[in-house]
Amino acid sequence: MAKAVGIDLGTTNSVIAVMEGGRPEVIVNAEGGRTTPSVVAYKGDEILVGQIARRQAALNPAATLFEVKRFIGRRWDEVKEEAARSPFTVKEGPSGSVRIEVNGKDLAPEQVSAEVLRKLVSDASAKLGNKITDAVITVPAYFDNSQREATRQAGEIAGLNVLRVINEPTAAALAYGLERKGNETVLVFDLGGGTFDVTILELGDGVFEVKSTAGDTHLGGADFDYRIVDWLAGEFQKEHNFDLRKDKQALQRLIEAAEKAKIDLSNASETSISLPFITFDPETRTPMHLERSLSRAKFEELTADLLRRVRQPVEQALSDAKLSAGDINEVILVGGSTRIPAVKRIVQDLVGKTPNESVNPDEAVALGAAVQAGIIQGDSSLGDIVLVDVTPLTLGVEVKGGMIAPMITRNTTVPAKKTEIYTTAENNQPGVEINVLQGERPMAADNKSLGRFKLEGIPPMPAGRAQIEVTFDIDANGILHVTAKEKTSGKESSITIENTTTLDKTDVERMVQEAEQNAAADKQRKEKVEKRNNLDSLRVQAVQQLEEQEGAAQDAKDRLKAAADEAEEAVRSEDDSKIADAQKKLEEELRSFMTANQASTQGQPEGTQAQANKADDDVIDADFKPAE
């Protein structure tokens, strides 16, 4: 049976891991990397994913998609500001959803994320020697129901059976606590590329119990990058009266340079940013260059408000868990953005202790997801591990006056089920519309509507007489199911809160088929490249033989050279039939050449080789002074 894997589907980078010998291990990708950039590029009919997509981004900014996790499961009115700063086109889709336009085609964020998942799983399957079908995928703890469901759908589009969707900080705690003994209260501080979570857990005797979670799904490393982008663009505009952010290619280069500068400033007090030929003067068409120095102090000044936003979720998580900073035994840092020195200082200041850096912030989440996958599959090496997680946001229904009536409050342990009785507001009311909400505000309009459904056929009766039983049921993935039943008549209606990103079952099935078709095309392209590379390697071998065997018969050398030249032409043509013919011919000529040469060598008089060896013995190694 193929093992299930754990996947950290990140904003900036993604990681895949598996249980091996009782320990979670990261699976390297085809390029040998432990992390894979969450970047997808569309180049003609070809889809590039990972490092290869990232490398060509500056030349193909409109069709190179990154940080798509910031749009997954979101509605257009939630992401308009973030969409405006992307080098690619993000726009409103059906029913207020988000779509990304590439080469005239509209893509759902789930489709793009599915390409990253497919790359991870394909590479891992090749490494493990088994096709992977089952996975645990992580999400930020503060992801709402829509975002969780959209992530699960991305896995489905990628051809995966998603065993569980679990919270990233909880997964990191699993990786941290797997081999630790004794009881601890741990605060996981997870600042990734696009999201921020704080989770407090109690660990002990194989039980991982989440006490509280808080966060901000609009805060991450990319926000720090864009502060540098805006500063660089502003400085350039002052000097040249031209806004680089209006040039997609220049904007892509700015984003890449900003990320590099941010990383440099984690280890240096100052860094240089050099972008030659960043654009051209619109009037004279002469090239323009950008050269700037950025100090760590200036970077902290540019991001001061972002750094302040880091504090509140930590304080809220402590308050919700009814703990003080002194009750925390360890602080675990997760996510690449926790390497920012100012972030580390804030954490230390808030909790009063130096963070534990024993876990790799880039890999801990995937490792923990692999542990969860092992638990689900019954991996005996893990023993009796129990994971108790919570729902991050309050769930409720809209009631008279536009208020929200909470059903399941935030930080309730999941799975969870709650039933409440509601009634009608008017005499002889034939039905009710139930608006399912998620959020912490008292008014329904200020919270996120997850879905609406109707319960009809209520018998005529005075206002307040009908008894409508509403049940909220959250599963282990944090996905919500709601039912409503009128007790007198027995009429019942229900809704599973999914399809909140306007991807219905038909959409998902179509995308799965497209993904499978792409997979077949990708396989064909890979096989074609391998055949071309094999022929080219054989050609190089033939050329080496010609150089090494100068004394071979001239007609044999001529035939081999002609076959090698034909192979070189076939490689350049990319014509499958030419490549196959050239491969066959070159193999035959090379085999014939080497056989003839070997026979010639064996047929030499015995003394010839001995004399050659004697001549070698007479050679004296010496260092000669070069001629003046």
From Swiss-Prot:
Polar residues bias locations:
594-612
Where does the source fall among the domains of life? Bacteria
Q: Which UniProt keywords apply?
A: ATP-binding, Chaperone, Nucleotide-binding, Phosphoprotein, Stress response
Question: Which Pfam family, giving just one, matches this sequence?
Answer: HSP70
Q: Which InterPro entries match?
A: ATPase_NBD (IPR043129), Chaperone_DnaK (IPR012725), Heat_shock_70_CS (IPR018181), HSP70_peptide-bd_sf (IPR029047), Hsp_70_fam (IPR013126)
Which one GO biological process term can you cite for this protein?
Answer: protein refolding
Q: Which residues carry this modification: Phosphothreonine?
A: T195
Give the span(s) annotated as Disordered. Answer: 547-628
Compositionally skewed regions (Basic and acidic residues) per UniProt: 555-591, 614-628
Q: Which SUPFAM superfamilies does UniProt cross-reference here? A: Actin-like ATPase domain, Heat shock protein 70kD (HSP70), peptide-binding domain
Q: What induces it?
A: By stress conditions e.g. heat shock.
What molecular function does GO assign, one term? Answer: ATP-dependent protein folding chaperone
Q: Which HAMAP family match?
A: DnaK
Q: Which family does it belong to?
A: Belongs to the heat shock protein 70 family.
Per the entry, what this protein does is: Acts as a chaperone.
NCBIfam families named among the record's database cross-references: PRK00290.1, prok_dnaK
Q: What is this protein called?
A: Chaperone protein DnaK
Species annotation: Deinococcus radiodurans (strain ATCC 13939 / DSM 20539 / JCM 16871 / CCUG 27074 / LMG 4051 / NBRC 15346 / NCIMB 9279 / VKM B-1422 / R1)
Please name the taxonomic classification of the source. Bacteria, Thermotogati, Deinococcota, Deinococci, Deinococcales
